[in-house]
């Protein structure tokens, strides 16, 4: 059988991801003597998958259940999409259907991952935010399918009255992220691509878990976007990242479902081994290290304060690439088991395969 250029590209990229997912994440010294993941470079257009040629066909009309439990019937294969949520927009890029987007969430022009993978999205009409969704603006674009965050559940009936077919997503943990991938892959007739995406994530997390093994789990305090006195409890996605990286959440007793406000006294009482700043924190590592109120905290005293990667996207949000946050965190918490190079290789392979670019920065 003759191999097309697209088939050859996808095969090479899959090999790169397999190399990352299957490589033991050993220390940097050992990693330097082993082969790095194969380098694959591709433009966003080449990396995109053409559903009709490469995917398992979906039959329409199609009835799916979205992440609010709503049964939604999609009458015909959607050719135009609108996404009111950066997480679903990123997921649609990973599924290779970015060219079908006609409207995206507000501030798309500020998202680095869009400029690297699908710059045309940054000039598309905005359909607002979860707080201020532009119903009429979205309807004017006449999209075949609209994807919104579950926070907009009260607005969905109005969207439907305007003739829009709407799916809500709520990828608040690892399983629900996989559920969002399944939902959108099925809706957009990209099922095979969705399965590949999930397998890539699962394989890399499995490699991470195997590398960490039974290493002792340090306690981790995950600090929020606005203040070091915000933290993520077990109900938040960040908790799964800590667990995936072989750590224990210092705020495991917190019951809030969003960033919890805590006191300096509480942080000192928990006395975490590490303090990790959110990707989008509007303060920096030095400000925490120099905070006199935290001087007696083990993490500060030992200099174990880090910020999650943010150069490409916020990896502590439930986007497809969020597993890289766990890999990075694993390299911080368990440097003898998980090398920094392993994190770089995983990032290279993932973004090349699913977003069409090779990272210039891993921070």
Locations of the language-model features?
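Structural recognition of the beta-strand scaffold that forms the well-ordered cores
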Residues: 82-84, 100-105, 145-149, 166-170, ...
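Proline-aspartate-enriched helix->loop->beta-strand connector
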Residues: 127-130, 135-148, 164, 263-280
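N-terminal low-complexity, Pro/Thr/Ser-rich intrinsically disordered segments
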Residues: 36-70, 74-75
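Sec-dependent N-terminal signal peptides of Gram-positive bacterial secreted proteins and lipoproteins
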Residues: 2-24
């Amino acid at each position: 059988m003759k191999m097309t250029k697209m088939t050859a590209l996808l095969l090479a990229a899959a090999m790169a991801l397999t190399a990352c997912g299957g490589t033991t994440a050993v220390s940097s010294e050992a990693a330097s003597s082993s082969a790095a993941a194969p380098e694959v470079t591709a433009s966003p257009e080449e990396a995109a998958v053409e559903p009709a040629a490469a995917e398992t066909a979906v039959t329409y009309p199609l009835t799916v259940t979205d992440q609010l439990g709503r049964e939604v019937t999609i009458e015909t294969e959607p050719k135009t999409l609108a996404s009111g949520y950066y997480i679903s927009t990123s997921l649609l890029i990973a599924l290779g259907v970015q060219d079908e987007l006609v409207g995206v969430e507000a501030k798309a022009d500020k998202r680095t991952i869009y400029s690297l993978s699908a710059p045309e999205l940054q000039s598309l009409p905005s359909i607002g935010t979860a707080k201020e969704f532009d119903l009429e603006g979205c309807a004017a674009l006449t999209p075949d399918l609209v994807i919104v965050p579950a926070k907009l559940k009260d607005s969905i009936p109005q969207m439907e009255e305007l003739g829009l077919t709407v799916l809500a997503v709520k990828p608040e943990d690892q399983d629900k992220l996989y559920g969002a991938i399944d939902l959108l892959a099925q809706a957009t007739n990209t099922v095979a691509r969705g399965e590949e995406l999930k397998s890539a994530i699962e394989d890399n997390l499995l490699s991470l878990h195997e590398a960490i093994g039974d290493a002792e789990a340090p306690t981790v305090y995950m600090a929020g976007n606005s203040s070091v006195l915000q933290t993520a409890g077990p109900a938040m996605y960040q908790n799964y990242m800590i667990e995936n990286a072989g750590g224990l959440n210092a705020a495991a007793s917190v019951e809030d479902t969003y960033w919890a406000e805590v006191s300096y006294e509480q942080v000192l009482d928990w006395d975490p081994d590490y303090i990790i700043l959110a990707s989008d924190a509007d303060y920096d590592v030095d400000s925490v290290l120099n905070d006199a109120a935290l001087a007696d905290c083990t993490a500060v005293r030992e200099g174990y304060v880090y910020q999650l990667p943010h150069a490409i996207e916020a990896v502590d949000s439930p986007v497809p690439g969020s597993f890289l946050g766990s890999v990075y965190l694993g390299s911080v918490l368990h440097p003898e088991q998980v090398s920094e190079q392993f994190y770089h290789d995983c990032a290279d392979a993932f973004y090349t395969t699913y977003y069409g670019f090779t990272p210039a920065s891993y921070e």
